[in-house]
Amino acid sequence: VKICVLGKPLSVNHAYVTTKQGRRFLSKEGVRYKQQIRADVLLAAGFSAESMREAARIADPQSRLRVSYTFHLPDLLNSGWPKKAKSRYKRLDLSNLLKILEDGLFEALGVDDSNVFEILLKKEESEAAWTDIEVTVLENDGRAEEAERNGAPRTVP
């Protein structure tokens, strides 16, 4: 499944709010971003509920997933480089961008994110902000099928 999420990704620092008691909640901004992700997943699936369910079937509970994220960001370069800025590129932690995006993606697909066995993260400079996501099922090494043929319940190797 290939999905394009438009706009600059929301950092985990802005996605959640913490109360005085220390409880964390999804912020209004986080709720909007998750809704946008769901809309983008629906767009990629072709708008119908059936095609949405079909997209979710890419991974049964036994499947191992590979997810590739490419963040296209317009503001990677420091404008003051080399005189005022200490580094050529702005400090941008990819893992901070990943959490809310991943939560929204797998919630929209109806897939358990514990099935993700491989993640590829990239950031690239561009004129506009968007994120390309590709979710694929990893090829099985054959052990599960062999065990299944021998009468054992199917498990992830």
What does each model-found stretch correspond to?
Residues V1-P157:
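Acidic, proline/glycine-enriched N-terminal capping motif
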